[in-house]
Structures are given as C-alpha cells and as structure tokens.
Swiss-Prot record:
This is Aspartyl/glutamyl-tRNA(Asn/Gln) amidotransferase subunit B. It comes from Helicobacter pylori (strain ATCC 700392 / 26695) (Campylobacter pylori). One of its GO terms (molecular function) is ATP binding. Allows the formation of correctly charged Asn-tRNA(Asn) or Gln-tRNA(Gln) through the transamidation of misacylated Asp-tRNA(Asn) or Glu-tRNA(Gln) in organisms which lack either or both of asparaginyl-tRNA or glutaminyl-tRNA synthetases. The reaction takes place in the presence of glutamine and ATP through an activated phospho-Asp-tRNA(Asn) or phospho-Glu-tRNA(Gln). Heterotrimer of A, B and C subunits.
Length: 474
C-alpha cells in the first residue's frame, strides 16, 4: 500500500537581543555556568518579569517576512510543567493569542513551487540546560529566559525534502532580516518534527509522533525518513495501533533511529492560563510601522541578482543561502568587480578552499581583499592561475595586502604593448621557418609562438600576447 507522510514543524528561533526576554541579564553564549542569571531567570519568589521591547520588534519583523497577521493585542500565558532546567516550574509563553498568526512560506519542490502555511509564531522564554555526566546531572541556567520565537507550521509537508526546503528558507529569512544568528551548533535554531503517515489519497490525520530538539538539517532529514519507514512498516505488519502512539521521541544520531522518550502531552496537560505578572502586549501603529521595515528578503534578492547581473539560478540560490555570502558579493560589486568574476572567486575559489574548521567568518580574507584580487584579474594585472596562488597565500597568512603580495610573488602581468610587440617580433624573427610553416596551414604552431613569447616576457597578459601574435602572423 502506498503511503504519504504528513509533516508539521515547530521551529524555535533564539532572538539575537543583547538581554533576555524578561530581565536585563546578558544572552551571551559560552559564559561560565549560571553566571548570566538573576532572581527573575532563577525563578526566585517575588521577582517580577519585564518584557524586552526588542523581542516584540523582532517578532513583528518575522511576521512581516512570512506575510502573516500581526496581532496588535496579544497575551502571555504560563505553560505549567516540571523539569530541572525550568526553575519556576512553568514557562512564560503565548497560547490563545500569539503575536503572529496565519503566515506562509513558498518553497521549491521537484513538482514546482509549494505554499507551506504557518499557523502561528509566538514569543516565549527558553529553559536552562541539563548536563548529564556519569551518574549525576548538572543544571546551567544561563540560557533560561533567553528570548525565543516558536514558529509552528501547518502539517503541509509530505516528505523530508519539503521539510528541509522549508527549514532552509526559514533559516535564511531570520538571518537576512537580522533577528537571529540561527547558529544551529549553539542551539539558536532548533526544530521539533511532528510526523504521521496515511494511505495515499486519504485525508484523515492519523497518530502523530513528535521528534524533539533536532539541530542539523542532515539529522532532521534522517529522523523524518526513519520515522516514516518505522510507521509504514508497523502499518503493513498490522501493528500500527500498538507501535505508533502519540509520544515524544529522540533521534539517536549514531544509530540513525528514533527512540521513545515519553508520552506526548496535550495542551490541556500544561494547564495554560494568563500570566498575572505581565500586562497584555499592545502594539501601537508607530511601533508596528517602525518594526515592519525589514531588510531585503532572500527571495527578492535572488530575483534581483538574476535580473540585474544575469546570474544563473544555482549561483543566485547559493549567494542568498547566507547573508555573509551576499555581503561579500555585493561588496565586490561596489569595488568594481564584474558579477561573473565575483561569483567565480567567491563561490568557487574561496568557498572551495574552506575546510571544516575554516569558515567565511574566520578565514581572514575580507571582502576588500577578495574584491581587490578579483579586480586585478578583470584589469588584466594578474592571470587567473596566478591569482589562485595569491588566494592560497592570503588564506595561509590570514589576510594581507593583495597588491604587495602580487609584487612579492612576482606575479604581475606585463601589459606594456610596446614591450610585448618587441619580444614577439624577436620570437618570429628567430623562428622564421616555423612562421612559414604556420602560414602554409600548420595552425597548431600558434601555441608554440605563444609559449615562446610568454617564456621571454615572464608574466605577460596572455590575451594581449594572443591578439598581437594574430595581428603579426596575419
């Protein structure tokens, strides 16, 4: 029996505010355990939360980017549950009236463009972090009370490819509009996947399983694919009702399987009620208009790159996958580098040399350095082959002066026409017999003349040498 998957995603995006959502503690990552804490995020009796206005602004920006409704009146609620990393024994979140509702994202699939509906996005505080070591556990509350947006999609995705396309687009959007660093390794962009199956053509929604805390696109895809296989096998073996229950599962990255963690709670189990310590959030027209001014979205940037610079779709897609790539590209254009040269030296040459621990952020080659190198190629002052040696040197030394390196390495091309003409005439004079052979039809000898001229000139511009040789040989 053919099955189809029904997939909905809950994405937790940590906002890049300087301070936490309900207190003035820093949100900086990697500090000593429990150093970025205060009575509010420790949940001490009598400590009262105060909403960070920047969180509201960033929520509005996200809502604008996904073409959603911005609810100018929303409320905070307490989500009650007990866990060691939640000191208050409740999480401040939004339930009945979220700040953002009814959005959408368009994704590219094998069958063409597809709309994924977004049910809601709401503000909430993050929990702390449990660290398990041997027979005991530690709790670090530095992350407690950091601001999150939880973005909840409708169950509109039908396979892991669509889920990853949605996540990658959302990941790019939150980075381009500047509301989150979305660093998956640091937990700034985490995903819970709700997965169920049904016979193809059936519109009924069957038992869904939630897979928690996935933080890499590769593992998200693997977890979804495994869960689809597990549920399909259970159905075909007649054990669906016994083996597929509403529960929370974890993905074991080593074994490539999902494992049962606990029964999945319903919303009633959390006993949501309005938080009495926080006023309702009212967004006036001034704040709304101010926050709705967002940076150019990746989709619009892609269209502009293809239209204005005649880029291929694959190249444009790569450039808009990362704000830093787009920044490098546009900076190179501002330096006067041709669009095609910029794409080649950024997306092929520089990215192709970066390894696991070396990234665009820490490679040491700035936009100005790469732009200067690419411009020297456009100007004919250095060959593409020699420029690769300069780029290798820049990476090795974590940066440097491009023009100084070209001179030090003796890679500057000769563009002096008079000097080139003089050498070419000497080459032709010394090889008069081969000139006669060339003129009698042996066209392959042209490469010989180019080689001799380049050898004597030691760094001439090949295109200039070719043009003059063709002229001299008739």
């Amino acid at each position: 029996m053919p099955f189809e998957a029904v997939i909905g995603l809950e994405v937790h995006v940590q906002l890049n505010t300087k301070t936490k959502i309900f207190c003035s503690c820093s949100t900086s990552f990697g500090e000593s355990p429990n150093s970025n804490t205060c009575p509010v995020c420790l949940g001490l009796p009598g400590a009262l939360p105060v909403l960070n206005k920047e969180v509201v602004k960033k929520a509005i920006q996200l809502g604008t980017a996904i073409e959603a409704n911005i609810n100018q009146y929303s409320i905070f609620a307490r989500k009650n549950y007990f866990y060691p990393d939640l000191p208050k024994a409740y999480q401040i979140s939004q339930f009945e009236v979220p700040i953002v509702s009814d959005g959408k994202l368009e994704i590219d699939t094998k069958e063409g463009a597809k709309i994924v509906r977004i049910e809601r996005a709401h503000m909430e505080e993050d929990a702390g972090k449990n660290i398990h070591e041997g027979s005991y556990s530690l709790v670090d509350l530095n992350r407690a009370c950091t601001p999150l947006l939880e973005i909840v999609s409708k169950p509109d995705m039908r396979n892991s490819e669509e889920a990853i396309a949605y996540l990658k687009k959302l990941h790019a959007i939150v980075r381009f509009i500047g509301i989150s660093d979305a660093n998956m390794q640091e937990g700034n962009f985490r995903c819970d996947a709700n997965v169920s199956i049904r016979p193809k053509g059936d519109e009924k929604l069957y038992t869904r399983v939630e897979i928690k805390n996935l933080n890499s696109f590769r593992f998200i895809a693997k977890a979804i694919e495994y869960e689809i296989e597990r549920q399909s096998a259970a159905w075909e073996n007649g054990r669906y009702n016994e083996e597929v229950v509403q529960e929370t599962r974890l993905f074991d990255t080593h074994k490539g399987i999902t494992l049962s963690m606990r029964n999945k709670e319903e919303s009633a189990d959390y006993r949501y009620f309005k938080d009495p310590d926080l006023y309702p959030v009212f967004i006036d027209e001034k704040l709304l208009k101010e926050a709705q001014k967002i940076n150019e979205l990746p989709s619009a940037k892609k269209i502009r790159y293809m239209k204005d610079f005649n880029l291929k779709e694959d190249d444009a897609n790569l450039l808009v996958s990362d704000p830093l790539l787009a920044q490098y590209f546009e900076s190179m254009l501002h330096l006067g580098v041709k669009a095609k040269t910029s794409v080649t030296w950024l997306c092929v040459e520089l990215l192709g040399r970066l390894k696991a621990e070396i990234t665009l952020e820490n490679c040491g080659v700035s936009t100005h350095m790469l732009g200067a190198l690419a411009k020297r190629i456009d100007e004919g002052k250095i060959s593409g082959k020699s420029a690769k040696d300069v780029l290798d040197k820049l990476l090795e030394e974590q940066g440097g002066d491009v023009d100084a390196l070209i001179e030090q390495m003796g890679l500057s091309q000769v563009n002096d026409t008079e000097a080139i003409v003089k050498v070419i005439e000497e080459v032709l004079k010394n090889n008069a017999d081969k000139v006669l052979e060339y003129k009698s039809g042996k066209d392959k000898l042209f490469g010989f003349f180019v080689g001799q001229a380049m050898k004597n000139l030691k760094g001439a511009n090949p295109s200039v040498v070719n043009a003059i040789l063709k002229e001299k040989l008739g």
